Design a protein with these regions (language model features):
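Oligomerization/assembly interface segments of phage tail-like spikes and tubes
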Residues: 47-71, 117-130, 264
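Short beta-strand and beta-hairpin "edge-sheet" elements
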Residues: 89, 93-136
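Short amphipathic beta-strand/extended segments with alternating polar/hydrophobic composition
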Residues: 14-23, 101-108, 211-218, 245-252
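Polar/acidic, low-complexity leader/linker segments enriched in S/T/G and N/D
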Residues: 1-41
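Residues at beta-strand starts and edge strands
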Residues: 1, 58-62, 101, 117-121, ...
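Intrinsically disordered, low-complexity segments enriched in serine, threonine, and glycine
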Residues: 140-290
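Compositionally biased, low-complexity regions
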Residues: 56-57, 61-91, 98
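"Short basic amphipathic alpha-helical interaction patches in structured regions
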Residues: 75-84, 120-122, 137-142
Length: 290
């Protein structure tokens, strides 16, 4: 199988472990499969079977075994040490004919045998975030006004639309990976009146009736960014160029919505002004195994 394997540090410096046999020859990559699950059970007193206490997935451990070939091995070994440093952040880029993903973690070890006839090495990377993420970002949009202007520009004197009002409060997006969180951006459409209250208490519903509701006014120029990813759940308001945490405006009963596998349909509502909102949903496909 043809593949590309690149390690990138926090400064953006990279080392390609799949260049040619005269550079690196990767012999084995562990950690591409889904990580093992940890399942805790307790036995029933005097009864067959047991009951489940909890089940979860541990961190991912990516272990790369390789050999170094050709000339200039010592120089390349020091280049490797420069990029892959123990305890430091590292991004793993992995690409095949059908998938292009990355995982993020921290280097546990980077060992190279210096005094053997066949120079070999092994890199161990621990990834607290267990998923592989697609390189591409996928978007879905809702807007109360849909742009209708297009080229070529009409040459007649007849009126033509610059935009049309949307009759639907629905938008959809397809998730080709595993269930995952996403980033939601809610912003007010432009207005001629500074600091005008454009909308009040926007709510996003999924197909199951679960919702995420943010109480309060949205003014001209406001941008609300919601992140629903596990381990990074935030609600941020950007007003006049200043970011502030508005997690306290999340209404009780709200759900941190996620993207299920396949097609997901969402509905946008508000106490008033829903047609004056623009909503953008962004996500990367996430995979437990590649």
């Amino acid at each position: 199988m043809f593949y590309t394997l690149i390690l990138e540090n926090q400064s953006g410096e990279q080392v390609n472990l799949s260049t040619t046999a005269n550079q690196y020859k990767t012999s084995k990559i562990e950690g591409l499969n889904p990580p093992a699950g940890t399942i805790s059970t307790s036995s029933y007193a005097g009864m067959n079977g047991s009951y489940l206490n909890n089940a979860f997935i541990e961190k991912r451990n990516v272990v790369i075994s390789f050999a170094m070939r050709g000339i200039g091995i010592e120089k390349r070994r020091h280049q490797l040490y420069h990029v892959v440093k123990p305890s430091r952040y590292i991004k793993i880029w992995y690409k095949t004919a059908n998938i292009d993903v990355y995982a993020e973690g921290y280097v546990e070890t980077c060992e190279v045998s210096n005094f053997e006839q066949q120079i070999s090495g092994q890199i161990s990377i621990l990834c607290p975030d267990i998923y592989w993420y697609s390189r591409d970002i996928f978007y879905a949009y809702y807007s109360g006004v849909i742009g209708a202007f297009h080229f070529p520009f009409p040459e007649s004197n007849a009126p033509f639309p610059l935009g049309v009002y949307s009759n639907s409060n629905l938008f959809s997006i397809t998730n080709d990976g595993d269930e995952t969180g996403f980033t939601l951006r809610i912003e007010a459409l432009p207005s001629d009146i500074p600091q005008e209250i454009v909308a009040v208490t926007p709510t996003i519903y999924n197909e199951n009736g679960e919702y995420l509701q943010i109480k309060g006014d949205i003014l001209t120029g406001d941008v609300i960014t919601v992140t629903t990813k596990t381990g990074n759940k935030t609600v941020t308001l950007t007003r006049n160029g200043v970011d502030s945490n508005i997690l306290n405006r999340l209404v009780s009963g709200s759900t941190w919505l996620t993207l299920k596998e396949g097609t997901n349909i969402f509905r946008v509502e508000a106490v008033r002004g829903v047609k004056k909102l623009r909503v953008t949903l962004m996500h990367r496909n996430s995979y437990l195994g590649v």
